Amino acid sequence: MVNLTIDGRKITVKENTTIMEAAAQNGIPIPKLCYLKGINEIAACRVCVVELEGKEKLITSCNNVAKEGMVIHTNSPKVRRHRRTTVELILSQHDCECVTCSRSGNCSLQTVANDLNIIEIPFKMEIERQPWNKEFPLIRDSSKCIKCMRCVQVCEKVQSLGVWDVEGTGSRTTINVAGHRTIEEASCALCGQCITHCPVGALRARDDTEDVWDAIADPDKIVVAQVAPAVRTAWGEEFGLSDKEATVGKILDALKRMGVDYAFDTTFSADLTIMEEGTEFLHRFTAGELKERPMFTSCCPGWLRFIKSQYPHLVRQLSTAKSPQQMFGAVMKTYFAEKLGVSPEKIYTVSVMPCVAKKGEKEMELFYQEYAGHDIDAVITTRELTKMIKSAHISPDTLADIDSDRPMQDGTGAGVIFGATGGVMEAALRTAHYLLKGENPPEDAFKAVRSTGFNQNQGIQEANFQIDNVTVRTAAVSGLGNARALLDRINKGEVHYDFVEVMAC
């Protein structure tokens, strides 16, 4: 154990604890912009500096370890002056149009600047603006980038793709797509991890809300919306709703009040995916097609983009089943359009999804005899949904917990567990068991693949199951870096599975 003093308080922490962690553990927050534990500990922003007695220069708290006898000051006049100047310099190279920023009210830089009471910038503004394709699902605004390196590190260390890199030197240092490529040329999986970890509004998903509003206002369009299982757990945070209050039924009611004609829960089409995927696995497994390499799930578009660019020889091992999002669109523009007695072109399908990769997935062009075009016409994220609710002046307190429209009202519990890593695998195995045995398996028969052990097992959960004295070897993987490690082991023959689920995030 290490004994030290922070802001006059004597504290004791474990060895190898950073000063920032030691302070946080004792209720002393130190501001930061670039720090991500275990991923980005390079002290690039210099906002987390503290004063160490006996040392003239300030030190960064995020990557300096607490040592015996240290006396630290986190908010001395010297620290405040340095921290304020640092943030003012960052702001002088940052587009401070906060009102029109997607991260307004949820921005680390905005919070730090407000806490330091910065009301004017004493330095000359020098804002960099790089061109970007605004049609791409992921949008980068270079004028808001603070060069924190988070996107670079998380893409390289967590997702193993290295889409982002540093360009230039000195004051001209910036972040851009690696290898002097455009984002379309890079191997971006659209996993969204760079967006999630960006502390400002430099990275965001393309906003498609106006397309949805236009469709709602078009009298010739029948707008049909679906809500993914994962959205129900996230949308309420923006409105301060508890998990019990933030139900999918209230989302459906909000969509109806916005003007959507029909609203459904994606759990229905998730059941369709599971039936197809479970049936396909059973066929390929019993036919001996999986003796060398496993069948992979196909419902995560980030994973699909990854395997197509990084392991094209394994694409044939993917399940041929569409994702629930795409199946929903196909059903709406064929069966549902027929039931309504309208042409497929009149149906405008909207997906409410938690993932930017779904915006890329919907843009795959598909042609059928019944109709030509996209299964899904627009995808909005959870954040876009909450913005639409606010812009429609809908108070969450007034929303009713309504049911999905018929005939796609009923669904099993399989679709709900899609939101958890391992949930697709568990649902598919339960379906395969039923198709093989003619009866449902015990409730917890395949729950092992959806355990909480991913963090302890490098993002991989392995499990073997016995069905009629036959062993089925499975694995569920979370994160593309972990997926790469597993695929390399499969290619080398070090491990063998029959069925593998991969989720990009």
Model-predicted segments: where are they?
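A short N-terminal beta-strand-loop micro-motif at the entrance of redox/enzyme domains
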Residues: R9-E15
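Fe-S ferredoxin-like electron-transfer domains
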Residues: R46-L190, T196, V200-D218, I222
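Charged, low-complexity surface patches
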Residues: T12, K134, K144, S187, ...
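Conserved SAM-binding loop
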Residues: T12, K147, F296
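Eukaryote-biased recognition of intrinsically disordered, low-complexity regulatory segments
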Residues: M1-D7
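Residue-level signature of catalytic and energy-coupling elements of molecular machines
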Residues: G8, C505
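Iron-sulfur-associated redox domains of electron-transfer enzymes in respiratory
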Residues: E15-V71, N75, V79, R206-A504
